[in-house]
Structure formats: structure tokens, C-alpha cells
Amino acid sequence: MDVLASYSIFQELQLVHDTGYFSALPSLEETWQQTCLELERYLQTEPRRISETFGEDLDCFLHASPPPCIEESFRRLDPLLLPVEAAICEKSSAVDILLSRDKLLSETCLSLQPASSSLDSYTAVNQAQLNAVTSLTPPSSPELSRHLVKTSQTLSAVDGTVTLKLVAKKAALSSVKVGGVATAAAAVTAAGAVKSGQSDSDQGGLGAEACPENKKRVHRCQFNGCRKVYTKSSHLKAHQRTHTGEKPYKCSWEGCEWRFARSDELTRHYRKHTGAKPFKCNHCDRCFSRSDHLALHMKRHI
């Protein structure tokens, strides 16, 4: 052990003679001495020298007088931004020098980190950037279905570059080395433009019909000169009755022979017989049998 003996050999023999055994547990003094030895082992002389030289340099910076060029620069600056007294100026300059030294030391420590960490961070950043570029188009948008580009991201960060393979339909594999987001976005846009040109040529110029609004309105009126388009077939049938003159909805009130082409017209007419007024104003107690009459009445309260 590196521990210094706290007893002499005679005291140890006397202790064995009196008690019959010798305790192997270290005493408080031995523990303290062992701690001192461990501290001296980990705290070598080189850090002490650096700290001592740094303290001496710090004293030189704190007690040194600022050069005249710094004083002239202080005088040229706005007096509201700097203190008036010269002593405070000297202290602020010394603090600036100290902060610059601390900044230099911190930058030096950061530069000593291994290059692998910077390479990993570079790869991680480029991975996030590539994910952001390739996820610019939502899955449900029509642009994705037209510009179908299968992307298989193959990253190789050996030389600090990232390789993105773009596989387009009816095209060969094209490996593009991406250096940043702008280059990746340009590559994806170019591939999309090629695919869009192919899709437009295949479809025969049906770009206007590919819009979501036009996809919904698929029910067109077949009568000559009519351009009405509806999203539901029932609405189309009700509209076609205006051309044919058909009125299948007959009023069931006794003695009434009115017929209508639409069911909502029959319901509105039936309220005249019953006197029902289901549309009530929120600002007053008036009720109406038709919703458009209520809308006209609501304009008075505005």
C-alpha cells in the first residue's frame, strides 16, 4: 500500500499482545493520507503550471493600462453607451480582454474534439435536411400522383458528402451528390419536371380535369346548351326535370292539385296549408316558414 504507517512496529506488537489481534481496517488518519495521495496522483504538476501562468497573465491584463488607441476609440463612441469616468473605462477594457481570452480558450477546447463527432453531426444534419426536402409534397396531393418519384436514400458520409439516389418511372438510376438543401431541392424538382412531362404527354393534355374540384363534379347535364355540373346524381335529376317539365311531387292536402319538380318545393308549399314556421329569429320572437325570408329579416338587426 501507498499509505504511510500511523503506528510504529512496537506499538503494533503491543496492540497484538494486549488484544490478541491486529485490526486491518484503516484508521481515519490512514484514510486521509490515502485521499491525499490519490489527489496528488490525479492533480499533476502540468495543470498547476498552466493555472499559475494563466493567473500571472490575468494579473498582467488586469493591472495593465489600456493603450491610447483604445482610449481614442472610447472617446469616438457615443458617450451614452460608455461610462464617463476613466477608471470604469479601464475596468471595462480589462473585462473585454478577459472575455476574449475565455472565448479563445473555449474555442480551442472545442477544436480539440475528434473529427468523427463533427462528421456524425454533419451526417445527421444532412439526413434531417433530406427528409425535409423529400417530404415537401403531402401524400394526398395530386402532385405526388403525377410526379411519382421513388426515393431511396443511400447515405455515404466517408468523404463528407451525402448521396441521394432518385429512381424515376421509365428512367435509369441517377445518383446525385447533395451538398445542401438547395441542391437536393433542385434535383427533386428536375426529376419531378421530367415525370410531369411524361404524364402530361400520356394523358393527352387533360390537366384541367385533374383538379380536385373537377373530379368531384362528375354529373353533367346532357341537354344541348346546358353546362350545369353537379356533385350528386340526385341534384342532376332534379335539374333535368326543369328541361323535361316533369313534376312527380304532388301536394297531399285535400283539394290541392299543386305538383312540384323538387321535394323541397313541396315541403315549402305544404307549410302554407299547415301554417308551420320553423325558422325563428334569434334577436326577436318572429318566425318564418322559409329560410330566405328569415335571412332577409336578419339584415334588419345588423
From Swiss-Prot:
UniProt-listed InterPro entries: Znf_C2H2_sf (IPR036236), Znf_C2H2_type (IPR013087)
Any one of the GO BP annotations: negative regulation of adipose tissue development
Single GO term (MF): DNA-binding transcription factor activity, RNA polymerase II-specific
Keyword Cytoplasm: no
Keyword Zinc recorded: yes
UniProt short sequence motif Nuclear localization signal, positions renumbered to this chain: 215-220
Sequence motif: 9aaTAD, positions: 93-101
UniProt keyword annotations, A-Z: Activator, DNA-binding, Metal-binding, Nucleus, Repeat, Transcription, Transcription regulation, Zinc, Zinc-finger
Coiled coil: none
Zinc finger residue ranges, C2H2-type: 219-243, 249-273, 279-301
Gene3D superfamilies: Classic Zinc Finger
Any one GO CC term of the record: nucleoplasm
Subcellular location(s) per record: Nucleus
Similarity-based family: Belongs to the krueppel C2H2-type zinc-finger protein family.
Record's function text: Transcriptional factor. Plays a critical role in neuronal morphogenesis and survival of sensory neurons. Represses the corneal epithelium differentiation. Also acts as a metabolic regulator, by modulating insulin sensitivity in pancreatic beta cells and skeletal muscle cells. Inhibits transcriptional inducers of adipogenesis and has a repressive role in the expression of several adipokines, including leptin.
Domain notes: The acidic N-terminal part may favor interaction with the basic domain of transcription factors. The 9aaTAD motif is a transactivation domain present in a large number of yeast and animal transcription factors. In KLF7, the motif is inactive.
SUBUNIT field: Interacts with FBXO38.
Name of the featured protein: Krueppel-like factor 7
Species assigned in the record: Homo sapiens
